[in-house]
């Protein structure tokens, strides 16, 4: 709720004391091959939007947006500003999904695990307007936490409550909102923050040691600044709904990150919320093992499909013929008897062999939990509600 107090004063950012990179160096969002200065809004630290949101520092960047910690001068609190490149479909879709989610009246606890939209507006740009979204400020992504962890593996003390929190959110998303996220991955799940001391520290550090940057005329590219990890980290929030879908029982087309693609995506089978369950399995494996389950990355998505399928066969066994009959692209990779026809070799391995972070009963319990998600047939994957009651996730 908006405060009745007078607006907070604006902070003046430092005008010196920062390192400036040579313009030949590509920094952060510039490293994407599709980056276009004309399609990007270059936020400047200290800039105020809508006469109320002052940018304090850069939190991160993605393929179509940048994220900034801001101070809401009217509400006297920290928020996150997400600024999209001009004219990208994800911006419109993300706002549409958030507004739809707001219309759902429910007491489901999973609502707390879904990022909410506080405000939205547009900024003018050279190639059209830039959509901007204002959210509650959140902490690090699970990917950032993994990178900071020993051996890039997240401890079960954190991973289990994080995963359970995500599954509760997905139960709401799938059963009450009937939304398929389609892009669940470690970069789209973030820590909920109860104490804004972390944001105060971020703000003060930016004042004391201003971020490295690149200055090219009126265009400034900043290096992102990391947030601290709270002592009471246990709750996470699912974010980034730019590719989410709702309004149908089944969908078609290419979705999901390359390395997380479910069988129905590569085989051309109509998909539903069970692709999110597959993705949770991929993400939990990444965080627990410190490595990807699927590794093949070739220049194009289609080029990597045979290797992706070969890896699936190695880890899950051959797909049921009944499933292949549902696939638009199945005959490209399999004969009518379900034999894999690609030249790509199927490794002699298994999930049991590749799981290296536990042993004994712990390993058995983890793999049982994982296999509730990593299944060829979508209907054989467990629901989010079934998974959140799994023994592995509830035994500390």
Enumerate the predicted regions with their spans:
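Intrinsically disordered, low-complexity regulatory segments of kinases
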Residues: 1-396
